[in-house]
């Protein structure tokens, strides 16, 4: 059964593993691909995203039974004054519907938390645009590099 799990510091090995995996991080190819996430960064990261999120950040692992299969998050972009979504499925688990289910759960939680709209910047060559459109997001803007998608949670 798919659920969202709040990771403890000792669970961040999975985030490190995903961020170090070339296939999982292929969506980030324009910015260098993989991102180091050594254990020395875990405490500060956990403090900012989990402990002291100030209502401006939300982060969970996607868990199917006892296996971590990805992550979902949203955060408030101060510069643009919008909430940005993050959905990453660990490469071995892609194509099994986890992204769609997790994005739907994330939207429900954001709505429960009083958020009216969610956005994401998706690279123009990233196939996840389809996922967002199927989950009710609409294209808000397009450039040569990325597509900004938006979903209204309150009508």
Each model region followed by its residue ranges:
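Conserved catalytic-core motifs of GNAT/GCN5-like acyltransferases
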Residues: 119-123, 136-151
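Alpha-helical elements of Rossmann-like donor-binding domains used by nucleotide-donor carbohydrate transfer enzymes
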Residues: 13-17, 41-44, 48, 101, ...
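Acetyl-CoA-dependent GNAT
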Residues: 35-84, 90-92, 143, 153-154
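A short, well-structured alpha-helix characteristic of acyl/acetyltransferase catalytic modules
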Residues: 1-39, 155
